[in-house]
Amino acid sequence: MKIIVSLFAVTIFFAACKKENATTATIEFIEPLANDTIIAGDSLHVEGTIIGNNEMHGYTLKMVNETTNEVLMNITSDSHASSYAFHEHRMNNVTQISTIAVTISANLDDAGKQATKTVKVVCLP
């Protein structure tokens, strides 16, 4: 009988333990704004924050010219933190009117779960 009571107590103990909340993140762009137009010779300014409710496992900032499929920038941070600030510049040197997708992906855990936000701008030659 003592064994049954002990097993019952252990079962109740483990059942009462709460799982840690899944990590979530809010990604905010300060710049660029959606559909901004960047003229030739100007810099495409990318700035913003990633705020998580738990520790995250880094982030990636990627710029892709959707007109030519060229990857213009691909920066990865592997640092573990509950918040990040990103700030990058890239000179607009396109040779044709191009849509540029700026994507931030926050790595929420080691299993590959991500939060992602994309802003698209137009670059003029």
Predicted features by range, described:
Residues 13-16:
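C-terminal motif of bacterial Sec signal peptides marking the signal peptidase cleavage site
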Residues 18-40, 124-125:
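Short, compositionally biased P/S/T/A/G/V-rich stretches that sit at domain boundaries
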Residues 36, 45-54, 108-110, 123:
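Extracellular acidic, Ser/Thr/Pro-rich low-complexity tracts
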Residues 52-67:
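Solvent-exposed loop/turn segments flanking beta-strands in beta-repeat/beta-sandwich domains
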Residues 79-89:
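Aromatic sugar-binding surface patches on proteins
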Residues 91-99:
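Surface-exposed, short loops/turns at beta-strand junctions within beta-sandwich domains
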Residues 106-116:
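Short acidic/polar inter-strand loop motif in beta-rich domains
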Residues 115-123:
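C-terminal edge beta-strand
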